[in-house]
């Protein structure tokens, strides 16, 4: 029978519930348990797909095409279980499902209310995510409840998990509550009052925490832990300190050494072998003992919030570990990059242009791609980063001076990038759209496969077939591929059915490492193996760094104005 651990948060948001949940899952997995994680988001959006990265951060995409919370990226990087659509749901999805049932007459004329109809639906969604009472059932499902205790939006979720705990019994559920213990510099002490109050709020809802994870910028002394225990009704051994660390990969060991996994296993009556965290210790050692350092310039549209590129940042660091190098990322707002100042990128060992939507800042990205191409700096373009590299090549090499994307200029005479109107989805169904289609849920999403051209750089990295996750509406225009090929661009991966361009590159006798991919490889990177594309990119960056050092960092070419 599946056991459930519910993780809630209090006082303030962004305490690290996702990292705490993923860390607990990793420890339990190391004990031999089959574990999954489920994220409940209390906003009314159906999914985060149409939300601004500045508001929500990264949208993480699963193999089955779900646009989900960035915490699912942490989950996949910490445990072996892959996330699915069922592992993340929102208030919007719950109400949509309830209202559809009401319209069908499933409630047999009853008045539809938050209790029991909405709360029952939440419980059904949780069980579905855990594969409850199916062949796919897990041993433990860790359920992260988004938001903060006391928020109106979270109340139906908290009531639902309270009911679920009551129905399933005390040995089948456990509650872990994160709270904030601030350090008041003027007083020179940690203050426990906010944690006392949030534990009280939780009890008023009907939930008694089994474990309190106390977030602070330092370890919490025994005296404060004893006080928190007394006023929160949690035994002192259940009051666990979570302090700031320089890498999130230290958190599993931190929680294990304070007995969190033992407490949960005792509460849930789980008889398991001891935890084995050697792989985590090895990982931390690798992060703390790099042999060299590389500097990457990331030219993006959402750089004011680094969470917009969370998986990408982690993928670069994973590749750094595989190459025994510390990766230092410097962010550049693409709106600030112009032909006059792009030469400031010359001091970097590699240039990366990530994905994005809309015309803002696109010309700066095109400048960055051109600068990398002309100065033979290793370049990796992801999604929009591939598209701007294609536009740049079309303008300055293929002679299509007005080349553009119809996303940025619908009337462009040379639409080398255009809207995809038909494609096969991750589940095999044929999807269509046009310029008037809704924004939400109408992109090419999820895992897609394509053939890789033999003899290409991509083939050295991926082999014969590449399968990666996608999230885009626009694609290289098939009508321009021959012209681009004749000018020297290598189209190294195409989908079999639609002939959509998946990877472009420059021949290695022209540029040592210049690759653009339409997909998002960062979503499949793990700290254990990295990702083959990022591993190859950082290896090329290291090689460029060595060569540039030997050549004395030759002066970069300035960009010439193009009429």
Swiss-Prot record:
The residues that hold ATP are 14-19, 71
**Any GO CC annotation of this UniProt entry:** cytosol
Name its species: Polaromonas sp. (strain JS666 / ATCC BAA-500)
Which is a GO BP term held by this UniProt record? Answer: pyrimidine nucleobase biosynthetic process
Tell me which UniProt keywords the record has, alphabetically: ATP-binding, Glutamine amidotransferase, Ligase, Magnesium, Metal-binding, Nucleotide-binding, Pyrimidine biosynthesis
- What is the name of this protein? CTP synthase
Quaternary state and interactors: Homotetramer.
The Enzyme Commission number assigned here is 6.3.4.2
Top enzyme class, one word, equals ligase
- What CDD domains does the annotation carry? CTPS_N, GATase1_CTP_Synthase
Organism superkingdom: Bacteria
Q: Where is this region: Amidoligase domain?
A: 1-270
InterPro entries associated with the record: Class_I_gatase-like, CTP_synthase, CTP_synthase_N, GATASE, GATase1_CTP_Synthase, P-loop_NTPase
**One function term, GO molecular function aspect:** metal ion binding
Q: What else is known?
A: CTPSs have evolved a hybrid strategy for distinguishing between UTP and CTP. The overlapping regions of the product feedback inhibitory and substrate sites recognize a common feature in both compounds, the triphosphate moiety. To differentiate isosteric substrate and product pyrimidine rings, an additional pocket far from the expected kinase/ligase catalytic site, specifically recognizes the cytosine and ribose portions of the product inhibitor.
């Amino acid at each position: 029978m599946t056991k459930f651990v519910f993780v809630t948060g209090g006082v303030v948001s962004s305490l690290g519930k996702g990292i705490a949940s993923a860390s607990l899952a990793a420890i339990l997995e190391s004990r031999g348990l089959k574990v999954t994680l489920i994220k409940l988001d209390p906003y009314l959006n159906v999914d985060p797909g149409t939300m601004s990265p500045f508001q929500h951060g990264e949208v993480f995409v699963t193999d089955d095409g779900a646009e989900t919370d960035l915490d699912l990226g942490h989950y996949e990087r910490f445990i072996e279980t892959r996330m699915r659509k069922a592992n993340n749901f929102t208030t919007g999805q719950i109400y949509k499902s309830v209202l559809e049932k009401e319209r069908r007459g499933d409630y047999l004329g009853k008045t539809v209310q938050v209790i029991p109809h909405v709360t029952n639906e939440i419980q059904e969604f949780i069980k579905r995510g855990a594969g409850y009472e199916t062949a796919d059932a897990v041993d433990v499902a860790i359920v992260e409840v988004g938001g903060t205790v006391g928020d109106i939006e979270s109340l139906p979720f908290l009531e639902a998990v309270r009911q679920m705990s009551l129905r399933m019994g005390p040995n089948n559920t456990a509650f872990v509550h994160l709270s904030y213990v601030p350090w008041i510099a003027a007083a020179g002490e940690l203050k426990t009052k906010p944690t006392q109050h949030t534990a009280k709020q939780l009890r008023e809802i009907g939930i008694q925490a089994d474990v309190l994870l106390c977030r602070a910028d330092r370890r919490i002394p025994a005296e404060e832990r004893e006080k928190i225990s007394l006023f929160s009704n949690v035994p002192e051994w259940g009051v666990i300190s979570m302090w700031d660390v320089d890498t999130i990969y230290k958190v599993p060991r931190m929680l294990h050494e304070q007995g969190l996994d033992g407490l949960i296993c005792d509460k849930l009556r789980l008889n398991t072998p001891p935890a084995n965290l050697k792989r985590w210790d090895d990982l931390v050692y690798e992060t703390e003992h790099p042999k060299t350092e590389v500097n990457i310039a990331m030219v993006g549209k959402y750089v004011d919030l680094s969470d917009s590129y969370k998986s990408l940042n982690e993928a670069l660091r994973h590749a750094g570990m595989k190459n025994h190098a510390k990766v230092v990322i410097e962010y550049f707002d693409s709106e600030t990059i112009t032909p006059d100042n792009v030469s400031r990128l010359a001091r970097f060992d590699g240039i990366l242009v990530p994905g994005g939507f809309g015309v803002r800042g696109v010309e700066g990205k095109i400048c960055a791609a051109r600068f990398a191409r002309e100065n033979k700096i290793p370049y990796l373009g992801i999604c929009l980063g591939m598209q701007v590299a294609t536009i740049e090549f079309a303008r300055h090499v293929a002679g299509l001076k007005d080349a553009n994307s119809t996303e940025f200029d619908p009337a462009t005479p040379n639409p080398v990038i255009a809207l995809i109107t038909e494609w096969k989805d991750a589940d095999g169904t044929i999807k269509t759209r046009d310029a008037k289609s809704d924004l939400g849920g109408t992109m090419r999403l999820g895992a897609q496969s394509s053939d890789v051209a033999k003899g290409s750089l991509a083939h050295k990295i991926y082999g014969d077939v590449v399968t990666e996750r996608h999230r885009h509406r626009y694609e290289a225009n098939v009508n321009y591929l021959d012209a681009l090929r004749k000018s020297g661009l290598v189209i190294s991966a195409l989908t079999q059915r639609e002939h959509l361009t998946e990877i472009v590159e420059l021949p290695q006798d022209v540029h040592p490492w210049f690759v653009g991919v339409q997909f998002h490889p960062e979503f499949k990177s793990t700290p254990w193996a990295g990702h083959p594309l990022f591993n190859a990119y950082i290896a090329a960056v290291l090689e460029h760094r060595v060569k540039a050092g030997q050549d004395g960092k030759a002066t970069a070419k300035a960009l010439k104005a193009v009429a």
